[in-house]
């Protein structure tokens, strides 16, 4: 069991200090406007506390992935829209369209106490001036980490969503600065998820969806030891159903994961894994985009002919009923991954019914970020859960009981 006993904001003398904060402002942007500012809002508690401590505050974040010079020169992945949003929420916010070099050093020097400076997308450093993909941020370049660390007295990691990665903007800074701590958001995340890994109230029920078994393999293996039931839907159930010898038509699955799926099912001696066995399907040959696929019919995987022209896009009524019966008895619940193509009204029912059942239960319930959080928001049910994590991959890594490098790098109490 991993217990993170890390310094928090309250454990460090921050008065009048220059503080560099890794935030997660990786938000959706359309037409140069932020269309969902949840992550910006969630960072405000930490930023406002630092303002109260009379700090000079430097903010770092990534936005999307940077794969070419075009990604930079087009400014489509610039944090400027984030700055425009942030300055409606805070006074004294500045933005610099750079994050390394002389201008950055000067801008930080000129910062006044209680001012906030947002630097440009950290991943601009993943491509050099010649267009070569060098991944200085994503591969934790020591030189980059040292530069950012040199700007401040204290480093605060408040980006839970990237804490499962060792980047220059989290691990790199922490390794090169004399004081580091976690922010309020990361603190909340660790406390909320720890309730599921440290003696959870039982029954402890896990619902896993999404497309790939490969993404969830480690978490399934870990949760087989700690959970009472693991309910599996979404695209990943196709690989398990295929491994059981059921027919899945033309549904997407991972051929390279079939043997692993068989092994997991064989190791499940206590029958903790409950698979969605009926699904809502549509004619595979007519699908151009799953998000606009027409309504289909319900089929049971074990009854279908092998080469039938169908693709499963949601769990069916029987599976919904079975899953809801386990959810009703649960005292702790972790949900990661939608159970169908919830963006399509014809295939949102599985995710909606399960989200609604969890929201109505008396259990301690956590959504593990990512698409399941997006689904809960779409159904206007997110506020009915005990906690909604900001990190899909990071929450899974935490539930795997694997070390989160971005947290591990922070000084212990």
UniProtKB/Swiss-Prot annotation:
Catalytic activity: (2R)-3-phosphoglycerate + ATP = (2R)-3-phospho-glyceroyl phosphate + ADP
UniProt key word Kinase: yes
Broad class of the protein's primary localization: cytoplasm
Keywords: ATP-binding, Cytoplasm, Glycolysis, Kinase, Nucleotide-binding, Transferase
Annotated transmembrane regions: none
Binding site for substrate: 24-26, 39, 62-65, 123, 165
Residues annotated for ATP binding in this entry: 216, 343, 369-372
CC terms in the record's Gene Ontology section: cytosol
Pathway: Carbohydrate degradation; glycolysis; pyruvate from D-glyceraldehyde 3-phosphate: step 2/5
Gene Ontology BP terms: gluconeogenesis; glycolytic process
UniProt keyword Secreted present: no
Subcellular location per the Swiss-Prot or TrEMBL entry: Cytoplasm
E.C. numbers: 2.7.2.3
Molecular function GO terms recorded: ADP binding; ATP binding; phosphoglycerate kinase activity
Principal EC category: transferase
Signal peptide start and end residues: none
Matching PANTHER family: PHOSPHOGLYCERATE KINASE, PHOSPHOGLYCERATE KINASE 1, CHLOROPLASTIC-RELATED
Family: Belongs to the phosphoglycerate kinase family.
Summary of subunit composition and partner proteins: Monomer.
Protein name: Phosphoglycerate kinase
